[in-house]
C-alpha cells in the first residue's frame, strides 16, 4: 500500500532477533519480503556480533549485509575490525549519521532505478 502512495524508502528495524524468539527469522526467511530489501544494515554490539551476524545473515537467509553499525563501531578499533573481518564498511550511526545516510543513499541510487532522480536530496539541501 505504501508503494502505491509514492513512498521511496521504508526502513524496517527488526530488533535484536536474528537468532532470538521475536519472529524476525520468519521475516528474514520470507523470499518476497527479502526481495524488497535493497540495503541491509547490521547493528552489532561487539566483534563477535559483527562476525556472527554477517555470517548468519548470509548463510541462513542469503542476505548480504551492506554496512555494519552499532556499538561495535563506537571507536576506530571496532571500525577497523569490521573492515578486516567482513570487508564491509563500519559506520557509527550516532557519531557519523550523515556519512551513514550518504552511504545508504549511494547504495539505493545504484540498486533502485530512478531512485532520487525526481526528488530533492535532503542531504545536499543541508550543505
Report the location of each language-model feature:
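Short acidic/histidine-rich motifs immediately flanking catalytic phosphotransfer sites
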Residues: 6
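C-terminal helix of von Willebrand factor
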Residues: 96-119
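Long, low-complexity, intrinsically disordered segments
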Residues: 118-127
Amino acid at each position: 500500500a505504501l508503494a502505491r502512495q509514492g513512498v521511496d524508502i521504508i526502513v524496517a528495524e527488526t530488533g535484536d532477533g536474528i537468532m532470538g524468539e521475536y519472529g524476525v527469522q520468519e521475516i528474514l526467511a520470507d523470499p518476497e519480503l527479502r526481495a524488497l530489501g535493497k540495503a541491509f544494515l547490521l547493528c552489532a554490539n561487539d566483534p563477535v556480533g559483527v562476525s556472527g551476524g554477517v555470517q548468519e545473515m548470509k548463510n541462513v537467509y542469503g542476505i548480504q549485509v551492506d554496512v555494519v553499525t552499532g556499538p561495535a563501531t563506537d571507536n576506530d578499533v571496532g571500525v577497523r575490525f569490521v573492515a578486516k573481518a567482513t570487508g564491509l564498511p563500519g559506520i557509527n550511526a550516532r557519531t557519523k549519521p550523515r556519512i551513514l545516510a550518504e552511504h545508504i543513499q549511494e547504495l539505493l541510487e545504484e540498486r533502485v532505478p530512478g531512485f532520487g532522480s525526481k526528488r530533492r536530496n535532503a542531504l545536499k539541501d543541508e550543505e
